[in-house]
Structure formats: structure tokens, C-alpha cells
């Protein structure tokens, strides 16, 4: 893809998300979603092959269905309330339909089937955009309408997303699919707290984006797409093995890493609202994710596969890939726990 075309498409993706973030008019929000969806498809098809074509088609069909449902719910809301302004939604049917449309865009269960398939069919760089930037716009709208959302529906979707994300990632050897199931789980955590404390959901999203960006960049730097290729990291890129270890454990939510902060604060907030069963189930399902993250860390950093002398010497040569953003991302993804009191004060 030519640089000028890539810049135009990328700026359209960013502009679409910004329109959604800063609009208070339902029609402009819908326009922003459409701009974002149509501009992201060429990025998904950047490496033109049948698998990328299939992934882009699946993404388009899912997002188009969600957009159609969103527009229908906006019209129902307009007929009931008489205005286009984003505020509390008086009609329960419109509220439920908007929630379903947004969760379909986010990839929450039971609308999660497209996420692993699309992520696996595209490149690592496109997958990074899909699992980070593309989550911002739907979550921002869910944040704005959180007082009107059907709490039982959202909590049911949240707990099923955590179960699906945990069980789905257990048997995977493809890193992109593992990160896709990880995304489904994290979206479930955000949906669970959205009804009670939407600010915590935004905090969770911020930390999730930093951790996922760092993980994707490490995988791109080492050209790893499977657990087998990741097992050669210690021989080819010895400095990256401990970094991948820390990021994986942070994604799993182990203290004292940054990934522990949102899980801790969400469980604490739910217990404050007299919910006991929900946070207990969430803590148990988190163990499923922790298992496959730990398996990845074992493969990457705790085992050394047989290698030739040429492979062992490879890490000493200067790499051509840029890693400027990697350092701040890894620091923020692993060392934010001391800032927890300050983050808690933001609620």
C-alpha cells in the first residue's frame, strides 16, 4: 500500500473514532462508526491473500449488522423521546437494542465468534489496531448510556464473555487467537463494572490497551505468530524473553504488575455493591486466562530449545525494526501498581 493512501485511510479511522467520542448527536455517532468501519477494512486487507479477504468480509458483515441494529434503535429512541441527543434512553427496547449493537461491535459473548477468526486472518499490525483502537468508540458510547443500560443483560454478557475467553484460549497455539480470546475476557471485565462504576471500565480499557500494544509489538519484533515460533525467543532475542514473560503475567492480572490494578478495583467495587457471586465467578474465570498466559511464559522464557551457533549469534547484530515506543509501553504495562491510590481517587 502506498504511503499516501495508508495515511489517508489511517486518518479516516482516527477521525471516525473522534467523531464518535466528541458527538452528542446520535446520527453523527452512527456516521462516525460507518467511517471507521469502511476505513479499517483496507487496513485489514493490507496483506492481500484469501485469508485476509475472508477475515475482512466477516468483519464487514458483523459490523454492518451492528450498525443497522444501532440505527434502528436510534430511530425507536427518536420516536419515543423526540430528540437525537445522547442521554438517558427512556424506551427499554431501544436501550436493549443499542446495548446489543455496541456489544456486537466490541465482540462480547454471544456475539464474539468473529473476533478470533478475523484476528487470525490478518497481520499482527492490523490485529493490534483491531483489538485496541477499535474498542474505544463502542465503549465510549456504552459509558455515556450506562445509566440506561439493562444491567442484567450486560452482566450476563460479561460473565459469559469471561468464560468464553478463558475456555477458548486454553487449546490455542496461534498467538493472535490467544490475544483475541484475551480481548473477549477483558471486554467482559469492562462490561461487568460498566453498570456500577463506568470510570473503572475506562481505566481498565486504558491499561488493557497499553498491555496489548506492548505484547503485539514484542510479537512483531520477534516475528512470532505461534507458540512454537515464540519458543525460539530465548535463542534469537534473549532480551525479549523476560519482557514477554512480564507482559503475559500482567495480562493475566498477577500482582505486583499493572494488570492486577483493574481486576482488584473491579472486584472491590462489585463487593461494595453487595455482589458476592459475580466477583467470585470473575476471579475463578481469571484463572483460566492465567493458565494459558503462564503456559506462554513457560514456553518463551523458562525453556531453551536446541539451536545452532548461527541462531545464537543472531541477537548480537543490530536490528532494523524500531522499538522506540516499546520502552514506555512496557514500563506502564508492568509498573503502575504504586499509583493505585491515585487511580482510585479518580472514581
Swiss-Prot record:
Membrane topology summary: Multi-pass membrane protein
GO molecular function: NADH dehydrogenase (ubiquinone) activity
GO BP: any one term: mitochondrial electron transport, NADH to ubiquinone
EC number: 7.1.1.2
Enzyme class: translocase
Predominant localisation class: mitochondrion
Name of a matching Pfam family: Proton_antipo_M
Subcellular location: Mitochondrion inner membrane
Annotated transmembrane regions: 5-22, 26-45, 60-80, 96-116, 122-142, 153-173, 178-198, 200-220, 237-257, 274-294, 325-345
Reactions listed under catalytic activity: a ubiquinone + NADH + 5 H(+)(in) = a ubiquinol + NAD(+) + 4 H(+)(out)
InterPro entries: Complex_I_Subunit_2, NADH_DH_su2_C, NADH_UbQ_OxRdtase_chain2, ND/Mrp_TM
Protein's UniProt keywords contain Metal-binding: no
A GO CC term assigned to this protein in UniProt: mitochondrial inner membrane
Keywords: Electron transport, Membrane, Mitochondrion, Mitochondrion inner membrane, NAD, Respiratory chain, Translocase, Transmembrane, Transmembrane helix, Transport, Ubiquinone
Family that this chain belongs to: Belongs to the complex I subunit 2 family.
Known function: Core subunit of the mitochondrial membrane respiratory chain NADH dehydrogenase (Complex I) which catalyzes electron transfer from NADH through the respiratory chain, using ubiquinone as an electron acceptor. Essential for the catalytic activity and assembly of complex I.
Quaternary structure, from the entry: Core subunit of respiratory chain NADH dehydrogenase (Complex I) which is composed of 45 different subunits. Interacts with TMEM242.
UniProt protein name: NADH-ubiquinone oxidoreductase chain 2
Gene encoding the protein: MT-ND2
Amino acid at each position: 500500500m502506498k504511503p499516501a493512501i495508508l495515511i489517508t485511510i489511517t486518518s479516516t479511522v482516527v477521525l471516525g473514532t473522534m467523531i464518535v467520542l466528541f458527538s452528542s448527536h446520535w446520527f453523527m455517532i452512527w456516521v462516525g462508526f460507518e467511517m471507521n468501519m469502511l476505513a479499517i477494512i483496507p487496513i485489514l486487507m493490507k496483506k492481500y491473500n484469501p485469508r485476509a479477504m475472508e477475515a475482512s468480509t466477516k468483519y464487514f458483515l458483523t459490523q454492518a449488522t451492528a450498525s443497522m441494529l444501532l440505527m434502528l434503535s436510534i430511530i425507536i429512541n427518536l420516536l419515543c423521546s423526540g430528540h437525537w441527543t445522547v442521554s438517558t434512553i427512556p424506551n427499554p427496547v431501544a436501550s436493549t437494542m443499542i446495548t446489543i449493537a455496541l456489544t456486537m461491535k466490541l465482540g462480547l459473548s454471544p456475539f464474539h465468534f468473529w473476533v478470533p477468526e478475523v484476528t487470525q486472518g490478518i497481520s499482527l499490525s492490523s490485529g493490534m489496531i483491531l483489538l485496541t483502537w477499535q474498542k474505544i468508540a463502542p465503549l465510549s458510547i456504552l459509558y455515556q448510556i450506562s445509566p440506561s443500560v439493562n444491567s442484567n443483560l450486560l452482566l450476563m454478557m460479561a460473565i459469559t464473555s469471561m468464560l468464553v475467553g478463558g475456555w477458548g484460549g486454553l487449546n490455542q497455539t496461534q498467538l493472535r487467537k490467544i490475544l483475541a480470546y484475551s480481548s473477549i475476557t477483558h471486554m467482559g471485565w469492562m462490561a461487568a463494572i460498566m453498570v456500577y462504576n463506568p470510570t473503572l471500565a475506562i481505566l481498565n480499557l486504558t491499561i488493557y490497551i497499553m498491555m496489548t500494544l506492548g505484547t503485539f509489538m514484542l510479537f512483531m519484533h520477534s516475528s512470532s505468530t505461534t507458540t512454537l515460533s515464540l519458543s525460539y525467543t530465548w535463542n534469537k532475542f534473549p532480551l525479549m524473553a523476560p519482557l514477554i514473560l512480564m507482559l503475559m503475567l500482567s495480562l493475566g492480572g498477577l500482582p505486583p504488575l499493572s494488570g492486577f490494578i483493574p481486576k482488584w478495583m473491579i472486584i472491590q467495587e462489585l463487593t461494595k455493591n453487595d455482589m458476592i457471586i459475580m466477583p467470585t465467578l470473575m476471579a475463578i474465570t481469571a484463572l483460566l486466562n492465567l493458565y494459558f498466559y503462564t503456559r506462554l511464559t513457560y514456553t518463551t522464557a523458562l525453556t531453551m530449545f536446541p539451536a545452532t551457533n548461527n541462531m545464537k549469534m543472531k541477537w548480537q547484530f543490530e536490528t532494523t525494526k524500531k522499538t522506540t515506543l516499546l520502552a514506555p509501553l512496557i514500563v506502564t504495562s508492568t509498573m503502575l501498581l504504586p499509583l493505585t491510590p491515585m487511580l482510585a481517587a479518580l472514581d
